[in-house]
Amino acid sequence: MSMEMASVATWTFLAEVPIPQDVLGVLVEGEQPYAAFKTMRDSAVFTSKRLIVRDAQGLTGRKVEIYSLPYSAINMWSTENAGTFDMNSEVELWTRAGHIKIKLGSQIDVRKIDRLISACVLISR
C-alpha cells in the first residue's frame, strides 16, 4: 500500500541510547520515558504519552527545537524492515499534523519500534 505524500518532517534514528536526563524536565506528571534514540543532531525519546524529538541547532548546539507528537495525533503508521539491497528500515506516521517519516539505522530493531508505537497509540485511545 503506497500512500505517497510530502512529509512534514523526516527524522533519522541512528542507534538506541540511554534516556537523556535533560528530557525529564519536559515530562508532565505521570509521564514515563520508555526508549531513546540518537538522531543526526540530538535525540528522540518515546514516552508513555508522546514522541519527543530534540533538534540542537547552530554551531554550539545551544539553540534547541523540541518537537512533541502526542500519540493521540497518530491516525495510522507503517513499518518497513530492511531488505537485501535497502539496508535501512523505515517508520511512517500519518498524523493530524501531516506525514512523518523516520529512517532507522541498521542496528535498530524496527519491530521493537512497531511494538512501542502500537502499545502507546492503542493504549492512549
What do these predicted ranges mean?
Residues 26-43, 47-99:
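Phosphoinositide-binding peripheral membrane targeting modules
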Residues 1-44, 107, 111, 123-125:
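Anionic N-terminal interaction surfaces
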Residues 95-113:
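Canonical phosphoinositide-binding patch of PH/PH-like domains
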Residues 115-117:
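C-terminal, charge/polar-rich interaction regions
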